[in-house]
A protein has these predicted regions:
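Compact, glycine/acidic-enriched structural inserts
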Residues: 87-124
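Arginine residue identity/basic-tract feature
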Residues: 62, 102-105, 131
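Serine/threonine-rich low-complexity intrinsically disordered regions
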Residues: 7, 12, 24, 92-95, ...
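A surface-exposed partner-binding patch
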Residues: 1-88, 141-180
Length: 180
């Protein structure tokens, strides 16, 4: 279903069964046809929601109505929220954004240049890949030190980090993404 998808594993069948009635049909189709892996040249990863759900609920003020679907190369979590729209939780800058209503529209526009410019930092990602190499499935690029602690948003101040651990660290040091 996703173009240029690089599969790393099947989505566990028990996960599909557990969530199939709570998520959009398109996501279930991705899980069944594509599984776990990367797309958009490695920028986005299809994740096992069980790995991120508790973290999202604890670290995001809308975590009770958000479901983790994807994670970006910078540790942002793409969510399905209120059974209606796709959002992005940006732990690096303690912010969130509503990307688009309806999952089918997200899939349609995810590779659109304007959409990518609005929500993803593809140029910085390409520079990071050129300098540090491709990410492993469980890695993201993280800023060192964290942006909240004074790092500059450039490739000289980043490194490859384990995605889940990095998001937990950002949450612990910044308090997560809360409604101010």
């Amino acid at each position: 279903m996703l173009e240029n998808f690089v599969k790393v594993a099947d989505m566990p069948q028990e996960v599909i069964e557990k969530y199939k009635d709570q998520v959009p049909a398109e996501l279930v189709q991705i899980w069944q046809e594509d599984g776990l892996g990367t797309f958009l040249d490695g920028y986005l990863k299809v994740i096992n929601p069980d790995d991120y759900l508790e973290l999202l609920q604890d670290s995001y003020f809308r975590g009770d109505v958000a479901f983790p679907m994807f994670v970006t190369a910078f540790g942002d979590v793409i969510t399905w929220e209120e059974n209606a729209y796709v959002g992005i939780v940006q732990y690096n800058i303690q912010d969130l954004d509503i990307m688009i209503k309806r999952m089918d529209r997200f899939i349609e526009y995810v590779d659109d240049e304007d959409f990518k410019d609005d929500y993803f930092d593809i140029p910085l990602y390409k520079k990071a890949v050129a300098r540090y190499g491709q990410l492993a499935y469980d890695e993201c690029f993280g800023f060192v030190p964290l942006l909240a602690l004074g790092a500059f948003k450039d490739v000289e101040h980043m490194d490859k980090l384990k995605t889940l651990e990095h998001i937990y660290l950002m949450y612990q040091l910044t308090g997560g993404v809360m409604d101010d």
